Design a protein with these regions (language model features):
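Phosphate/pyrophosphate-binding active-site segments
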Residues: 2, 195, 289-386, 492, ...
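Active-site diphosphate/adenylate-binding microenvironment
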Residues: 11, 16, 31-35, 342-420, ...
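A generic structural signal for residues located within well-ordered alpha-helices
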Residues: 30, 53, 215, 359-360, ...
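Charged, low-complexity, helix-prone segments enriched in Lys/Glu/Asp/Gln
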Residues: 61, 336-354, 420, 456-458, ...
Length: 549
C-alpha cells in the first residue's frame, strides 16, 4: 500500500496544481517539512535576505502575471517581517498568498517561544486568513486562498501551517482550479452610461489600477480616441493609454493641485474606469456635487460621500467599454484639454533640458526614458522621486511603471525589480529609489547576484527623507526637521555585494552609464546626486498656475 503523503507534501502538490512555479521566502524550524516538500517539487524556491523582500517579490509577481505570487516565512519574527509586503499587496490589489509556519497545536494555548496568533494578525491585511488545523482540509484551504487572492479586486491571503499538522498524513488531494467566468454589465446601465457620456459637455476619463488589472488598455484608448475624451490616469494606471496619445493628460496624484486638476474643475462628467479610492481620493481630483460620475469597473463602487456615481456599470471592463461605444456618440475636439496638454508638454521639455549637476529630477527621468524601450519596466520606490516619476516619466504600456500607491511602501523597488526581471529576463528593468528607500531592502541585491537576476538600481541621493522634507517645507514656511542623514558609499557597497557600482557626477554621464549598466550580466547600482530644490520651485509654480486659471 502506498504511503500517504504528509500535509506539507499535499500543500505543495496544491501549489503546483495552482500553477505556482516560484516561491520567495526564508526557511525556519517550523517550516522544515514544507521546505523539503518544496525541494522535491518542480517549484523554484528563492531564499531572500529579509521576509519583507519576499513579500514584495510575490506582490510584483502577482501584479505582472495576474496569478498569485507566493511568499513564505517561519513563525514569530519571520511572519511579522512579512507584514508590510502583504499589506502592500492587500491595498494595492496584487494577488498574493502568504504561507507561515507555526508552533504545534499543542503549544497554542500556552505562552510559548515565538508564538503569536498569526491568523488573527494577518486578518486586517488580507482578504482571507486561515490556519490548517485538520490535514484533510488542506486542499480546500489552499484552493480558497488562491481563489480569494485572484478573484474580484485581487489582494493578499494567508495560510498558517502548524508544525505538527505539517508532519501528519493527509487524506487530501489538490482541488481542481475552476476557471472564473467574466460577469457582463446590465444593458440598462450600459445604455444609461452611454446617454450621460453622449450628452456631456466636458467629460474626463479617470483611469485607475483596476483598468490595468483587467487588461482594458486597448478599450480605454479606443473610448478616448473615438469619443474625443481626455484621459487622466492614477499613478498605478500609468500607461493605460500611451502618454504620447493626444488625449492623454498624464497622471494625477501628487500632493499639489496640478494642471490636470483644471480638467476636473471644468468637468461635468467623470468616467471613472477601474478607479480605486485607496489610491487617489475623490477630494484629490476635486469630486463635487454638481459633477456626474459614471463608475465602470468589475466591482461596485466603494461608499464615499464624495464619490456617488449616477450609474454603475459593473462587469468586464473592456466589454463594458466596447458596449458603451456602440451606443455613445460625440463630435468635436476637447479644445481646452488639447491646449492644456500642449502647455504641459512644453513645460516638461523645458525642465528636461537643464544640464546642471546635481541633476534636476525632470532631466534624470528624461534621460531614463531615452534609454528604456517602450515595454521596458521601471519600478519606483516611495519618496520624492515617486512624485516626479508620476508627473514626468512617460509611459506607453500598462505595467511598465510599477508604483506602490495604495499602501505606498518604502523599500518596494529593489525586490519588485527582482521579480519583474525574473519574469521578463529579455526586458530592461530599472529600480528607482531614494537613498532612504534603498537602505530598507538593499540586501536583496545579494539575492539578485546569487540568483543571476541582473536589473539596474538608480539611487537618487539627497541624504534625507526628501518627500517628508518637502511636506515640512510646504507646511512650515520652508523649515524642516529630523529628516537628514548621512549615507555609506553606495558604489562601494554595491561592489561589496558583487554588483557593478557607478556614480554620476555630470548630467551628460547618466545616459552612457545607464547603457553600460544594462549590458552587465550582474546587477548594477548607479548613484546620481539630485537637486531637490526643484520641489519647492514646483510647489510655488503650481500655486501661480492655479492663481491665474
Amino acid at each position: 500500500m502506498k504511503e500517504m503523503k504528509t500535509t506539507a507534501q499535499v500543500l505543495v502538490d496544491c501549489l503546483e496544481a495552482e500553477g505556482v512555479d516560484v516561491m520567495f521566502g526564508i526557511p525556519g524550524e517550523e517550516t522544515l517539512d514544507l521546505m523539503f516538500a518544496i525541494r522535491d517539487s518542480k517549484i523554484r524556491f528563492i531564499p531572500v535576505r529579509h521576509e519583507q523582500g519576499a513579500a514584495f517579490m510575490a506582490d510584483v509577481y502577482g501584479r505582472l502575471t495576474g496569478r498569485a505570487g507566493v511568499c513564505l516565512s517561519t513563525l514569530g519574527p519571520g511572519a511579522t517581517n512579512l507584514v508590510t509586503g502583504v499589506a502592500d499587496a492587500y491595498l494595492d490589489g496584487a494577488p498574493l498568498v502568504a504561507i507561515t509556519g507555526q508552533v504545534g497545536t499543542d503549544r497554542m494555548q500556552l505562552t510559548s517561544h515565538q508564538y503569536l496568533d498569526l491568523t488573527a494578525m494577518f486578518e486586517p491585511i488580507t482578504k482571507r486568513s486561515k490556519q490548517i488545523i485538520r490535514p484533510d482540509t488542506v486542499g480546500e484551504i489552499v484552493r480558497l486562498a488562491f481563489k480569494h487572492a485572484e478573484k474580484g479586486k485581487p489582494g493578499a491571503t494567508h495560510i498558517d501551517l502548524p508544525q505538527n499538522i505539517a508532519k501528519m498524513p493527509a487524506d487530501a488531494v489538490p482541488l481542481k482550479c475552476q476557471q472564473m467566468h467574466e460577469v457582463y454589465a446590465d444593458p440598462t446601465h450600459i445604455a444609461a452610461a452611454g446617454k450621460i457620456i453622449s450628452e456631456a459637455k466636458n467629460p474626463v476619463i479617470l483611469a485607475g489600477a483596476g483598468a490595468v488589472r483587467s487588461h482594458a488598455a486597448a478599450a480605454v484608448t479606443e473610448l478616448a480616441d473615438r469619443l474625443h475624451i481626455p484621459v487622466v490616469n492614477t499613478m498605478m494606471a500609468k500607461g493605460i493609454i500611451p502618454m504620447d496619445d493626444k488625449y492623454s493628460l498624464w497622471t494625477i496624484g501628487i500632493p499639489q493641485k496640478d494642471y490636470v486638476n483644471q480638467l476636473f474643475d471644468r468637468a461635468d462628467v467623470v468616467i471613472a474606469i477601474g478607479y480605486d479610492i485607496v489610491e487617489c481620493t475623490p477630494a484629490k481630483w476635486g469630486a463635487r456635487e454638481n459633477m456626474t460620475i459614471v463608475h465602470i469597473d468589475s466591482a461596485p463602487a466603494d461608499v464615499n460621500k464624495r464619490y456617488q456615481p449616477a450609474v454603475e456599470v459593473v462587469g468586464d471592463i473592456s466589454e463594458s467599454l466596447y458596449e458603451i461605444l456602440r451606443c455613445a456618440r460625440r463630435t468635436g475636439e476637447p479644445e481646452f484639454a488639447l491646449a492644456l496638454r500642449q502647455t504641459m508638454v512644453a513645460e516638461h521639455e523645458a525642465m528636461a533640458a537643464d544640464d546642471s549637476c546635481p541633476m534636476k529630477p525632470a532631466r534624470i527621468l528624461a534621460d531614463v526614458r531615452k534609454v528604456m524601450g517602450r515595454d521596458d519596466i521601471v519600478v519606483s520606490d516611495v519618496g520624492t522621486h515617486k512624485m516626479w516619476i508620476a508627473r514626468h516619466y512617460d509611459c506607453y504600456e500598462p505595467n511598465t511603471c510599477l508604483i506602490s500607491n495604495g499602501f505606498a511602501s518604502m523599500g518596494f523597488s529593489i525586490p519588485g525589480a527582482f521579480a519583474a526581471k525574473l519574469l521578463y529576463p529579455e526586458k530592461k528593468v530599472l529600480a528607482v529609489c531614494g537613498d532612504g528607500g534603498f537602505m530598507m531592502n538593499s540586501q536583496e541585491l545579494e539575492t539578485a547576484v546569487r540568483e543571476h537576476v541582473p536589473f539596474v538600481t538608480l539611487i537618487w541621493e539627497d541624504s534625507s527623507y526628501g518627500l517628508i522634507k518637502w511636506k515640512e517645507q510646504e507646511q512650515f514656511c520652508g523649515e524642516h526637521c529630523y529628516v537628514d542623514f548621512s549615507n555609506p558609499n553606495f558604489k562601494l557597497l554595491a561592489e561589496a555585494m558583487r554588483c557593478k557600482g557607478y556614480r554620476v557626477e555630470k548630467a551628460e554621464e547618466l545616459i552612457p552609464t545607464l547603457e553600460e549598466a544594462f549590458k552587465q550580466d550582474v546587477p548594477s547600482v548607479i548613484v546620481v546626486p539630485v537637486d531637490y530644490s526643484e520641489n519647492m520651485k514646483l510647489t510655488e509654480h503650481l500655486k501661480q498656475v492655479y492663481a491665474q486659471k
